[in-house]
Curated annotation (Swiss-Prot):
<dbReference type="GO" id="GO:0003924">
    <property type="term" value="F:GTPase activity"/>
</dbReference>
<dbReference type="InterPro" id="IPR000217">
    <property type="entry name" value="Tubulin"/>
</dbReference>
<keyword id="KW-0206">Cytoskeleton</keyword>
<comment type="subunit">
    <text>Dimer of alpha and beta chains. A typical microtubule is a hollow water-filled tube with an outer diameter of 25 nm and an inner diameter of 15 nM. Alpha-beta heterodimers associate head-to-tail to form protofilaments running lengthwise along the microtubule wall with the beta-tubulin subunit facing the microtubule plus end conferring a structural polarity. Microtubules usually have 13 protofilaments but different protofilament numbers can be found in some organisms and specialized cells.</text>
</comment>
<feature type="binding site">
    <location>
        <position position="226"/>
    </location>
    <ligand>
        <name>GTP</name>
    </ligand>
</feature>
<keyword id="KW-0479">Metal-binding</keyword>
<keyword id="KW-0547">Nucleotide-binding</keyword>
<feature type="binding site">
    <location>
        <position position="69"/>
    </location>
    <ligand>
        <name>GTP</name>
    </ligand>
</feature>
<feature type="binding site">
    <location>
        <position position="142"/>
    </location>
    <ligand>
        <name>GTP</name>
    </ligand>
</feature>
<dbReference type="GO" id="GO:0005737">
    <property type="term" value="C:cytoplasm"/>
</dbReference>
<keyword id="KW-0963">Cytoplasm</keyword>
<feature type="binding site">
    <location>
        <position position="138"/>
    </location>
    <ligand>
        <name>GTP</name>
    </ligand>
</feature>
<feature type="compositionally biased region" description="Acidic residues">
    <location>
        <begin position="432"/>
        <end position="448"/>
    </location>
</feature>
<protein>
    <recommendedName>
        <fullName>Tubulin beta chain</fullName>
    </recommendedName>
</protein>
<comment type="function">
    <text>Tubulin is the major constituent of microtubules, a cylinder consisting of laterally associated linear protofilaments composed of alpha- and beta-tubulin heterodimers. Microtubules grow by the addition of GTP-tubulin dimers to the microtubule end, where a stabilizing cap forms. Below the cap, tubulin dimers are in GDP-bound state, owing to GTPase activity of alpha-tubulin.</text>
</comment>
<feature type="binding site">
    <location>
        <position position="144"/>
    </location>
    <ligand>
        <name>GTP</name>
    </ligand>
</feature>
<dbReference type="GO" id="GO:0046872">
    <property type="term" value="F:metal ion binding"/>
</dbReference>
Length: 448
């Protein structure tokens, strides 16, 4: 069986993680203490992708919860699913990282990281066939960003051939939680480019927009946002956990989605999203799912794919869906929106089907897109970074923890490189390549 070890770091990561385990437990028929009381054998069949079986029909998440301060952990423990987790898997410090990436990556976090890696190692040893790691964290803070990326590189060293998928909450364009967000995010992206296999970019502002525009919530809470994220996270791994006609897993996803190793930052979406009162007024069908799934308003990252082009994308359908209908819809989308897909990757939509829908829905779909427009997100953070770094504002907090200014410069140029790589592939077309071939072939004619 293909197991996944799940890490949640920092406040944001732990809160999303808590919502995710709530979703997953519901899908597999587990109650708040991990006891199975579901109705279908299918729920049990691949329970061990995310859960270890303990004695007495109790299932324990293969999750490692990490934070540099005990607050969030206590909140998770006191939450509705707090009794689910194994107590040894809570690893926390006392000092906190104080939104300082250097503290999370070099000082406070580095002291705690070996403890975390021990727990990860123990979880990995209990697996038959480890598929990879999933990490939830934010890139704007200290622990999730600094220590999260440190963990990723440590795990990379130890398990070089396993998939590393991260769900990273990017800083929002308008809403900022901390002033030093651009620093933390740029330093984190610098790490993710090198060490992660697939990074799903999520952004609070886009989530707020979805909650307000589509779900018609007047003042959405973080709980509502995390619920949206957990729907996508559950969708990405649904093929591992339930049978389907066309399977996908983290590795297949990466192979189909990442045309060039550095360009592994994805936009995600989920359908159907309807406001609570409007459920009874619409029937969900494949065309409707497809339409909503490819709607820019539905993307959970604040960049508009109409400003770029899709290199690749993946659609994961759940429920009783006809294969043919899905393929027709996908072909339809590609032919209607040709300008939004690069023409040098002919069939760039990967589809997967899973026969079991999420709770309370007849069918649903998860969308993952690798679009060049994600560069907007990095550009925005990069501009804010440059503005502050030019004046060396707040830098003493980082150098005081032993960081060097060089590291900032490197991170900045790495992010700028990433942006220009995306731009280069956005502008690339088939014809450029053909002209070169023609030039090479021409001399042959004269030789005859």
């Amino acid at each position: 069986m293909r197991e996944i070890v799940y890490l949640q770091t920092g406040q944001c990561g732990n809160q999303i993680g808590a919502a995710f385990w709530q979703t997953i437990s519901g899908e597999h028929g587990l109650d708040g203490s991990g006891v199975y009381n579901g109705s279908s054998d299918l729920q049990l069949e691949r329970m061990n992708v995310y859960f270890n079986e303990a004695s007495g029909n109790k299932y324990v998440p293969r999750a490692v919860l990490v934070d540099l301060e005990p607050g969030t952990m206590d909140a998770v423990r006191a939450g509705p699913f707090g009794q689910l987790f194994r107590p040894d898997n809570f690893v926390f410090g006392q000092s906190g990282a104080g939104n300082n990436w250097a503290k999370g990556h070099y000082t406070e976090g580095a002291e705690l990281v070996d403890q975390v890696v021990d727990v990860v190692r123990r979880e990995a040893e209990g697996c038959d066939c480890l598929q990879g790691f999933q990490i939830t964290h934010s890139l704007g803070g200290g622990t999730g960003a600094g220590m999260g990326t440190l963990l990723i590189s440590k795990i990379r060293e130890e398990f070089p051939d396993r998939m590393m998928a991260t769900f990273s909450v990017m800083p929002s364009p308008k809403v900022s939680d901390t002033v030093v967000e651009p620093y933390n995010a740029t330093l984190s992206v610098h790490q993710l480019v090198e060490h992660s296999d697939e990074t799903f970019c999520i952004d609070n502002e886009a989530l707020y927009d979805i909650c307000m525009r589509t779900l018609k919530l007047s003042n959405p809470s973080y709980g509502d946002l995390n619920h949206l994220v957990s729907a996508v996270m559950s969708g990405v791994t649904t093929c591992l956990r339930f049978p389907g006609q066309l399977n996908s897993d983290l590795r297949k996803l990466a192979v189909n989605m990442v045309p060039f190793p550095r360009l592994h930052f994805f936009m995600v979406g989920f359908a159907p999203l309807t406001s609570r009162g409007a459920h009874s007024f619409r029937a969900v069908s494949v065309p409707e799912l497809t339409q909503q799934m490819f709607d820019p308003k539905n993307m959970m990252a604040a960049s508009d794919f109409r400003n770029g082009r899709y290199l690749t994308c993946s659609a994961i359908f759940r429920g009783k869906v006809s294969m043919k209908e899905v393929e027709d819809q996908m072909r339809n989308i590609q032919s209607k929106n040709q300008t939004y897909f690069v023409e040098w990757i002919p069939n760039n939509i990967q589809t997967a089907l899973c026969s079991i829908p999420p709770r309370g829905l007849k069918m649903s779909s998860t969308f993952i897109g690798n679009s060049t427009s994600i560069q907007e997100l990095f550009k925005r953070v990069g501009d804010q970074f440059t503005a502050m770094f030019r004046r060396k504002a707040f830098l003493h907090w980082y150098t005081g923890e032993g960081m060097d200014e060089m590291e900032f410069t490197e991170a900045e140029s790495n992010m700028n490189d990433l942006v220009s790589e995306y731009q280069q592939y956005q502008d690339a077309s088939i014809s450029e390549g053909e002209e070169e071939y023609l030039e090479e072939e021409e001399p042959l004619e004269h030789e005859e």
